Amino acid sequence: MALNVNRAVADPFYRYKMPKLSAKVEGKGNGIKTVISNMSEIAKALERPPMYPTKYFGCELGAQTNFDAKNERYIVNGEHDANKLQDILDGFIKKFVLCKSCENPETQLFVRKNNIKSKCKACGCSFDIDLKHKLSTFIMKNPPKIDVDFSKAEQKNGKKTSGADAAAAVAADIIHNSDKGSSNDDDDDDWEPEPVEPNGMLSAGMGKLVLDKDLEKSEEQRLDMLHTFFLKAKEEDRISDAKGQTALRDEAERLELKQKASLLLANVFLDEKVITDKQISKHRNLLLRFTLNDKKAQRYLLGGVEQVIHKHEAELLSKSAHIIKSLYDEDVCEEDSLISWGEKPSSKYVSKSFAKKIIENSQPVLNWLKEAEEETEEESDDEIAFGGDVKESEFLRQQKEKAAREAQQKSAKATNGNAAAASGANDEEDLDIDDI
């Protein structure tokens, strides 16, 4: 069934049509997802890359999205009704497809000087796209391709040109023509074409017009790319300031791996000196850019910490409690996340048996967190001092003394009970003898 692209138009003979959105729910539990089976056809009708409307769904629904262009699978995490998605698609069409003047869906998008321009091929109107929407940021990082007719470029230049020359020439021609058709004289400077480099290479501005295909790669490939990016940033010491740290987060967001990036952070920036060099405190701001108010990211970070402890077992296994306490003290991991981690050992990052060892060594801290949660009012001001260079902290010593006192009390009670029983038996024997 075909629908009008602009569903506000009720005319059955409206020339601009698109397929009705078809959605299929797959999986169950935490893995439930909605696959939009005909997103490629819809995107073709709208003349937009299929990842744009898919990403728009994610922005509006607050859900993660996945693209597999090779197999034409466009996924929105969670269970979503097709009619609801169709209504949300209308919002995308209104904001990113329809012309603001003639309301026809014959617009083209151009990313130019940190701005997104829309040019209508029907009426010639040119206007800016709202940059406040989250999708605008995605479009800036993943600009649409320009379809180049190389034969026209050659005819215009009067000679054969390289592919790069032709692409630059046609793109410049499109931008130049959009100036002539625009009613807004203030945009003239912004739309002035940049000169084509004589060596045939695309300029930096034209390079951004190539669609970023990294999102079409598998998650494993993207994780490898992000891991390499983190290693290079560490090697070049680009993480000491806010700008460098933000660059790492932006790259993770570009590859749609912000939560799982925490796992890589632990492996790249933490090692056997995590306690002695106070590495968690040192990289606190960087870690918080990924884990703040995000319990999934915190769980991935704890998985990475497990791997670091496993890699340096001799040095770190006995200091597991210190590491967990440091994560808590620096607000990198929340109390609930740490307690939940300690209650259920996982085999996802290290073997289950080794995960249990880490949790056992961290038990004093986990017990303290549970007690603090139960007795918040009484123990809100309690502080626990952990020294990285001290083998046994004051806190651990207190926990052991407490356990020893409880054992002594139990032993004393048992001794007193046995003495009372013996005394009762003697009394009974005395009474029997007196009776005789």
From Swiss-Prot:
PROSITE patterns: W2
Single Gene Ontology BP annotation: translation
Any single GO CC term annotated in Swiss-Prot or TrEMBL for this entry: cytosol
Domain W2: 216-379
Bias (Acidic residues) ranges: 184-195, 426-436
Region: Disordered, residue numbers: 177-203, 396-436
Keywords, in A-Z order: GTP-binding, Initiation factor, Nucleotide-binding, Protein biosynthesis
Any one Pfam family match given in the protein's UniProt record, by short name: W2
Protein name (Swiss-Prot/TrEMBL): Eukaryotic translation initiation factor 5
Domain of life: Eukaryota
SMART domains, A to Z: eIF2B_5 (SM00653), eIF5C (SM00515)
Phenotype of gene-disrupted mutants: RNAi-mediated knockdown results in a decrease in protein synthesis and an increase in the expression of gpdh-1 independent of hypertonic stress.
Similarity comment: family membership: Belongs to the eIF-2-beta/eIF-5 family.
CDD domains: W2_eIF5
Basic and acidic residues biased stretches: 396-408
Low complexity compositional bias, start-end: 409-425
Source organism of this protein record: Caenorhabditis elegans
Record flagged with keyword Protein biosynthesis: yes
Molecular-function GO terms, alphabetical: eukaryotic initiation factor eIF2 binding; GDP-dissociation inhibitor activity; GTP binding; translation initiation factor activity
Binding site for GTP: 27-34
Function: Catalyzes the hydrolysis of GTP bound to the 40S ribosomal initiation complex (40S.mRNA.Met-tRNA[F].eIF-2.GTP) with the subsequent joining of a 60S ribosomal subunit resulting in the release of eIF-2 and the guanine nucleotide. The subsequent joining of a 60S ribosomal subunit results in the formation of a functional 80S initiation complex (80S.mRNA.Met-tRNA[F]).
